[in-house]
A protein has these predicted regions:
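Short beta-strand->loop micro-motif that forms the acidic, two-metal-ion catalytic signature
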Residues: 51-55
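Catalytic core of pol beta-like nucleotidyltransferases
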Residues: 1-32, 40-46, 56-115
Length: 115
């Protein structure tokens, strides 16, 4: 996990993670938010980013545009983030396929929000 005492402005910290989760819930309509990757495994370092899977309702027309919209809303939170947006039906199709990040998120991720 990132060392909070270093004070690096881009560092992944629990306070920034909580702020990012709150902001995503505020600006998007997520069905579920899953954190995954090095932060969840407790292996984050100064070169790590925060991996966030945003599962949306199926009526989101363009997941890529939704990801950009979320990223813009998170501009004030200074840490590197990888935001993956996937509609619910696509999530159900892909979550068990080996080699995809969806499977890692499902198997090793931490659900931080579910509506």
């Amino acid at each position: 996990m990132a060392n909070a005492s270093t004070g690096k402005p881009w560092e992944v910290t629990s306070d920034k993670v909580e702020a990012a989760v709150r902001k995503i819930i505020e600006v998007s309509r997520p069905l579920k938010l899953i954190l995954f990757g090095s932060y969840v495994r407790g292996e984050a370092n100064l070169n790590s980013d925060l991996d966030i899977l945003v599962i949306t309702p199926d009526d989101i027309e363009n997941p890529r545009k939704e990801s950009v919209r979320i990223r813009r809303a998170l501009r004030g939170i200074s840490m590197p983030m990888d935001i993956v947006v996937v509609p619910r039906t696509k999530w159900e199709e892909l979550k068990n396929l080996p080699g995809l990040i969806y499977r890692e998120a499902m198997m090793k991720g931490r659900v931080v929000y579910e509506s």
